[in-house]
């Protein structure tokens, strides 16, 4: 049985800080190609920003360029422990209608697991 750790792409760990500007957020999401970035403080997850959040913010905010990660992020994102089973990740994604989960290891940000990872490994 595969664990989240087995699927985690350790070198793809998109992250920004609370004060990161919108340009940095967009670059991080684009370069890591997962459609998401964690917002961290002292290696702990404090929020998440998805490409969908960015699109919604474009329609709401008049001065988009002055926004920081803290202004855009969703607080209390869904997370999963690095030692959880991959099937648990799938169930969490299905029940919350999401395609990415932030992964924690001893309450520290460890990376992202994506629905595509589960599909690729035949979990779904």
Where in this protein do the model-derived segments appear?
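Bateman (tandem CBS) regulatory domains
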Residues: 1-13, 66-77
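Phosphate-coordinating loops and pocket residues in cytosolic domains that bind phosphorylated ligands
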Residues: 9, 59-60, 74, 120
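The conserved cystathionine-beta-synthase
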Residues: 15-33, 40, 58, 79-99, ...
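Glycine-rich acetyl-CoA-binding "A-motif" of GNAT/NAT acetyltransferases
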Residues: 45-48, 109-112
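Nucleotide-binding motor/catalytic cores of P-loop/tubulin-like NTPases across gene-expression machines
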Residues: 47, 51-53, 62, 66-69
């Amino acid at each position: 049985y595969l664990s989240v750790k087995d699927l985690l792409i350790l070198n793809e760990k998109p992250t920004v800080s609370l004060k990161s500007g919108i340009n940095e957020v967009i670059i991080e999401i684009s370069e890591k190609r997962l459609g998401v970035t964690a917002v961290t403080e002292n290696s702990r997850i404090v929020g998440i920003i998805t490409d969908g959040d960015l699109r919604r913010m474009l329609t709401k905010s008049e001065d988009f360029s002055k926004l920081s990660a803290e202004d855009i992020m969703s607080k209390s994102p869904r997370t999963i422990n690095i030692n959880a089973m991959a099937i648990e990740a799938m169930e969490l994604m299905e029940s919350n209608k999401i395609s990415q989960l932030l992964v924690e290891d001893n309450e520290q940000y460890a990376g992202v697991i994506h629905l595509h990872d589960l599909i690729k490994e035949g979990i779904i």
